[in-house]
Regions:
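Long, positively charged binding patches that form subdomain-scale interaction surfaces
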Residues: 11-15, 42, 48, 55-67, ...
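Conserved catalytic residues of ABC-type ATPase nucleotide-binding domains
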Residues: 1-15, 22-28, 32-33
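Outer membrane beta-barrel transmembrane domains
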Residues: 105-118, 129-131, 156-179
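Repeated loop/turn-to-beta-strand initiation elements of outer-membrane beta-barrel proteins
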Residues: 12-15, 72, 132-136, 170-175
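Transmembrane beta-barrel architecture of outer-membrane proteins
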Residues: 1, 12-14, 53-59, 73-75, ...
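Extracellular/periplasm-exposed beta-strand and loop segments of Gram-negative cell-envelope proteins
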Residues: 24-54, 85-98, 102-115, 151-156
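Residues on the lipid-exposed face of transmembrane beta-strands in outer-membrane beta-barrel proteins
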Residues: 3-9, 19-21, 58-64, 78-82, ...
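Solvent-exposed loop/turn segments connecting transmembrane beta-strands
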Residues: 1, 69-70, 149-156
Length: 179
């Protein structure tokens, strides 16, 4: 869930920014989890990490619109995002010795990691006008961190489809009609 604002200029380019609230759940292998060295004195034989994180994502993107028709258009965009980690909950599966039984321990952090402009994104999408002021947008995306994310500095790539409604402000519509 979230909110964004954008502006299309010269009927081809767009600049957008947003604020999204997301839950990131993942499982990481010991080789993918890059915690500080002191961590491994507590979990010397890490088996896996299950994570459940609440993240605020703040993307800034530049887009190019092509194939514009009266009621629809296609676009491609590139973005840089900041991730603000609000809550990180980790469930560690580990052994105290190489032959020991697997044990579990949960640990949570709050407001501890901020990754400013450290996630690169690419997307493409389709925008369809519903009315003069409202459009529906479907936008498949791929996001890749430049550095690891969270306490374990995990390369948390993500992909999905963002569905959104775009509303053109009434004041902008009045200016367009006067031209």
């Amino acid at each position: 869930t979230g909110i964004g604002i954008g502006y299309i200029f010269r009927d081809r380019f767009s600049l957008r920014a947003g604020f999204y609230n997301a839950d990131k759940k993942y499982t990481a292998s010991p080789s993918a989890y890059n915690a500080p060295a002191s961590f491994y004195s507590y979990y010397p034989y890490l088996v896996k990490v299950d994570a459940d994180c609440r993240v605020y994502e703040i993307p800034v993107s530049l887009g190019y619109h092509f194939g514009a028709r009266k009621n629809h258009s296609w676009f491609a965009s590139a973005s840089l995002s900041s991730y603000l980690m609000k809550r990180e909950t980790y469930n560690y599966s580990y052994k105290t010795s190489a032959w020991g039984t697997v044990q579990q321990r949960e640990w949570s952090l709050y407001n501890s990691n901020q990754h400013l402009f450290s996630v690169i994104g690419i997307s493409g999408g389709y925008q369809r006008k519903i009315t003069n002021r409202i459009s529906f947008i479907a936008e498949p995306y791929l996001r890749m961190p430049v550095n690891g994310v969270g306490y374990g500095k995990v390369k948390l790539n993500s992909a999905g489809v963002l569905f959104s409604l775009a509303v053109e402000p009434a004041a902008f519509m009045l200016r367009k009609q006067k031209k």
